[in-house]
Amino acid sequence: MKDLLKFLKQQSKTEEFEGIKIGLASPDLIRSWSFGEVKKPETINYRTFKPEREGLFCARIFGPVKDYECLCGKYKRLKHRGVICEKCGVEVTQTKVRRERMGHIDLASPVAHIWFLKSLPSRIGLMLDMTLRDIERVLYFESFVVIEPGMTSLERGQMLTEENYLDALEEYGDEFEAKMGAEAVLELLRAIDLEKEIEEMREELPSINSETRRKKITKRLKLIEAFYQSGNKPEWMILKVLPVLPPDLRPLVPLDGGRFATSDLNDLYRRVINRNNRLKRLLDLAAPDIIVRNEKRMLQESVDALLDNGRRGRAITGSNKRPLKSLADMIKGKQGRFRQNLLGKRVDYSGRSVITVGPTLRLHQCGLPKKMALELFKPFIYGKLEGRGLATTIKAAKKMVEREVPEVWDVLDDVIREHPVMLNRAPTLHRLGIQAFEPVLIEGKAIQLHPLVCAAYNADFDGDQMAVHVPLTLEAQLEARSLMMSTNNILSPANGEPVITPSQDVVLGLYYTSRERINGRGEGMAFESVAEVEKAYRTGVAELHARVKVRITETTIAEDGERTESRRIVDTTVGRALLSQVLPKGLSYDLVNQNMGKKQISKLLNTCYRQLGLKDTVIFADQLMYTGFHFATVSGASVGINDMVIPDEKYSLVADAEAEVLEIQEQFQSGLVTAGERYNKVIDIWASANEKVSKAMMDNLSTETVINRDGEEETQASFNSIYMMADSGARGSAAQIRQLAGMRGLMAKPDGSIIETPITANFREGLNVLQYFISTHGARKGLADTALKTANSGYLTRRLVDVAQDLVVIEDDCGTHEGLTMKPLIEGGDVVEPLRERVLGRVVAEDVYYPGTEDVLAPRNTLLDEAWCDKLEEHSIDEVKVRSVISCDTDFGVCAACYGRDLARGHLINQGEAIGVVAAQSIGEPGTQLTMRTFHIGGAASRASAENNVQVKNAGTVKLHNAKHVTNSDGKLVIVSRSSEIAIIDELGREKERYKVPYGTVLEKLEDATVNAGEVIANRDPHTHPIVSEVAGSIKFVDMIEGVTMTRQTDELTGLSSIVVMDVGQRPTAGKEMRPAIRLVGADGNDLMIPGTEVPAQYFLPGKAIVNQDDNAQIAVGDALARIPQESSKTRDITGGLPRVADLFEARKPKEPAILAEYSGTISFGKETKGKRRLVITPADGGKPYEEMIPKWRNLNVFEGEKVERGEVIADGPEAAHDILRLRGIHKVANYIVNEVQDVYRLQGVKINDKHIEVIIRQMLRKCEITEAGDSEFLPGEQVEVSRVKIANRELEAQGKEPAKFERELLGITKASLATESFISAASFQETTRVLTEAAVGGKSDKLRGLKENVIVGRLIPAGTGYAYHTSRNQAAQNGPAEEVPAISASEAEQNLADLLNLAGSPE
């Protein structure tokens, strides 16, 4: 018996390996793998079902069909192990070897491997420097190629058609050699001397001027170097020997009725063998050339189909007209080996069932049906039954369990105790989609789920199903309990807020409990303690909502954990006093002494977690839930039709709107307004009518008038059920109530345009047929959108996970001083995100000082928690430089200090945390909530955009940011710079609002003036763009010739005449080269200079400019010299929602991006060409001027002679991330992407921490382009990982050599995933063929650094609990082999394990 065990053990040991290398297999290597040549296309004998000899399933080559039994039956049983039968030639061994042993086919003629031929760029083509078309013509026998030119005028690699070849033969005889087919290509490849080629090309590179040629040579050089360094030989891209897959991996299964189900590969192999055998025979017979050629071509095609069916020509189809699945199809795509079998596997010890509510469970429990538990824990039960002596053998135990003897249930109870199970609901969008619970046995067949974890699972009880998994080993149970238990996952990893907040019924119950009612029964009573309140409530003396006075006891916990009690009397209600009973000690009573809506409850739980920690919060959350359910039941809140009160004013409001619409209609018919204006106005009228109706309705619903104790009328918040549900945040919203009791309002057509006749009815009144029909559009669109959205969002998540999967925290501090400067986010007049929310949980990068002093408030490397943020707010700090993963210096990972707080745990992140995957999940999970559509800005919205003044919302002082300005004759400031901003600062120096002010805005207030809320501080004309004079003087026209460069126009109404500059296209030839301008001269007739510069005050006028001054007129500073009419900006569709997020992460270029200045300098315009303007920037330091052609229709923001800074906007438009990175640097591009992504999510009310987006951006920025190679081995223009360049540069600097210079590159997430160092990870993501081809040619080796690679090879991942295992392995690898581990006998191991299990199961 012992021998048997020993024998079984030794087969499963795999050798340790550091990485996986992929390369090309030489013919000799293929032969060395093989156990014999497959010569016949036969598979198995259909009568005996025995494999045919030398066929595709031959037992002699691949091994026996039955365990330890040769084919003819001469040798059976274990004792003949390893004998080779002399009759049938089969080795007696396990049948498992049929999964491992390969065969081979010797090809009669070499065949090109289709991956290296057709996978773009064609590797064979690059190697030979020939085009793919030419090579294909050679391979498929359409033309000859010269192999040895000899002494002739032909060139090596030259193509010859059949005729040319015959001519050449006549001319030169056998001086030269030309061939066709794969043999020819093979000889060409064999003749390449890699070393010589590399030397020649490296010498040639510096002298090449043409960009395309340099690119081509660099590509070829890279390929040849890859071959040279990896030891691959180019001729191995042509196959001489074809390996045959082991037969059990391409099985043939007999079905009943004498038919067979077979893997497609068998068909493909059969074709290859048939053609190969036929070709051999033809060659032996010395058949005519044309027949042999045809057969060779067919062989090439059948091998192509076997390797990658459908890559060339039409795919070979089987009997049922579908393409056969080739070897390449086996590994790629969702059903391929990578994604189906290696990255996701099915597991045993799992069950699934429908879920129902378990309102009586505790947070760490779930209800598990008895039947399910019995099945899942069977092995444990057998073991326990045997151990207790209730069953003698496993078989007996099995019988007992099948009969469900009473003892079995006792044993099951025992087994289940403290044994967590994992519950999972598909789709698992983030890590909270699998959590561990302790099972509680229940009758019935449905799993019971705790209501508070529904939010994390996104589960509801309308038929959702969930799966149960049992962690078997001790380690797995330990991990499930300590990391995955629902009680340990209270905070969301996406934003650090509680994810187990009550919703729906619970919220309604708590809200109802905490409301107050005027003149309730028992109002005005005073109680000595909360217990007394409860007594009064239970006996019916005081009702739940009565306003009373109560003396309460509060506990405060100091920093050192010391508790102090204090008593005070508070004005409160009976309900709130009852709520305070479940409030944990240490929280202030004020937290429940208010109307408890959903937001308040969430804040309450958050406060509880931060102040009292995990355990108290869990208990408190459960208590809140029980209380909420109880009082929601007591309240009797329900939805009745009478609760939907329709306001009386509705009908008059609708009538008024109809009258207004009629008026507009009349104006339109008499031609006063255009069709477009009429449409927009009608929509505006109805939109505002709808607003008024819904306001009237909400006012009506939300208050009621009651008689108070003094007999007077008083209004209070209403107890209307529907209003309470909406107000508490339990269910429904004002918009939904509006449709029930107000009016449904305007509807959209399927194309997104708004129908101008609104639905004036509501659901209580009911809709007529037309109204109902209009409504169906929206409902259908919603359903279609949802389906699309789910797929798109899932794909985005997959790309994000793939790009970030290998990012892990690997050290505590990288020591960098870099970071991002955080300020509060302000848009227009609102603080969208205060500073505290942006820096909470981050680490300070540079000391923060007390304002105006040199004293340090928060030293560098402080982790900013809630207390620190309060301090920053106290001292009104409004910018902090914090560490960020984008600027982290760690190679192949990030450090804990740059990441900051682990949001799901609330402390500094641990080493080994897989932050990349968490970030991807946090961004991808809310993806399904984002909208899919692009917004058409039409009707009401488009006119709002043309504001003509800036009105402030808060009092404060005015501050200008990068604004140049002049003072006009009225003493007001006029802005004469482009990207100026005006901000309002409060008395503490905090910024409250910020507005962009364009060129030509007139400021009503000077800088540092104080303003009151509601004041207008700036005015401008939104429809024209002025040119403002910066000096006072008299006007001189330059190149202004009537009829040539300008025309005079007189306004009919006012009689004023103005000069209009003509567009270049409209001018006669004489005016084409002229450049009309206005020059300002002083009283002495000399040119005036722009103040502070040597530039003459000369303003060039673009086409269509309107000049209202005459020649020689006097002008003051700040006056408008000319106006350029702005055509109302085209209403651009705003891409919103999911597509916008995807565009940002894919770093796609917008259609018409903003044009940014490439250098700092002075603007001038050069010679114009057809349709384009030439913009010239002359650098201030006198460098070479930079020119750029810009289409004429782009609205430029700059004038001649103006100074611009590098990266400033020259022409408006959406900014391209690549430009921002190039011109403004890495921090600006990070800021831009973070803000843009956050805008989309914020619109949907989804909170995601900036950190997660930064993690993805770090991965998008991980490549760089080498600009100067220095003394490194990189090539200029090569794309390399930044970490690798940094490491190489450190070594070079240490040796005193020249380091390489590089520029960071921004890659979209798909590009970045495919460009990762690990080819296994890239291949399992997308474009498997291309990735593997590239890796094989380069002989790449995968160091298995990331998570995916390790999952695929079946190891622990280098993150989380597997992190320690990997660190110790890496250290062991560096320190050399470890000493032998002392062996341990089976009995000892069993004893140790029993002790361990005993420990775990003991009540202590």
Swiss-Prot record:
What enzyme category does the UniProt record give? Answer: transferase
Q: Which reaction does it catalyse?
A: RNA(n) + a ribonucleoside 5'-triphosphate = RNA(n+1) + diphosphate
Gene Ontology annotations of biological process type:
DNA-templated transcription
Q: Which cysteines are joined by disulfide bonds?
A: none
MF-aspect GO terms: DNA binding; DNA-directed RNA polymerase activity; magnesium ion binding; zinc ion binding
Q: GO CC annotation: what is one?
A: DNA-directed RNA polymerase complex
What is its cofactor?
Mg(2+); Zn(2+)
* TM stretches of this protein: none
Question: By its UniProt entry, which SUPFAM superfamilies does this protein fall under?
Answer: beta and beta-prime subunits of DNA dependent RNA-polymerase (SSF64484)
Family stated for the protein in its record: Belongs to the RNA polymerase beta' chain family.
- Self-association and partners: The RNAP catalytic core consists of 2 alpha, 1 beta, 1 beta' and 1 omega subunit. When a sigma factor is associated with the core the holoenzyme is formed, which can initiate transcription.
Put simply, this protein is called DNA-directed RNA polymerase subunit beta'
Its lineage opens with: Bacteria, Pseudomonadati, Pseudomonadota, Gammaproteobacteria, Alteromonadales
